[in-house]
Amino acid sequence: MISTHVLDAGRGVPLPGVLVRLSRLEPLDTTRVISELTTDDDGRIPTLASEALEVGFYRLEFHLDGLGSTFFRAVQLDLRVDDPTRSYHVPLLVAPFGVTSYRGS
């Protein structure tokens, strides 16, 4: 399972309405879109994939262009799933001129 939480680090509040796309990275630099969801009022998407994950690489794309409060139009994170039975929580903290992400719990 992959989940996310998007926060406005400058104001200390969640960011609702952020479009997040999850894709699986396939051979030859192709991608297969798994889901496109929008963060809820608390800035969360509890489950980005309804299908079972496989070992491999995935891409999270956060579309920030509608926010108006950040320099970044979008943020793309490529991550590795080593164990599909584990949960992968990937928060994104957005500031006017910077972004931070990490593997949460």
Q: Which stretches of residues belong to each language-model region?
A:
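Compositionally biased low-complexity segments at domain edges in trafficked proteins
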Residues: 87-105
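Beta-strand-dominated extracellular/periplasmic modules and repeats
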Residues: 1-83, 89-91
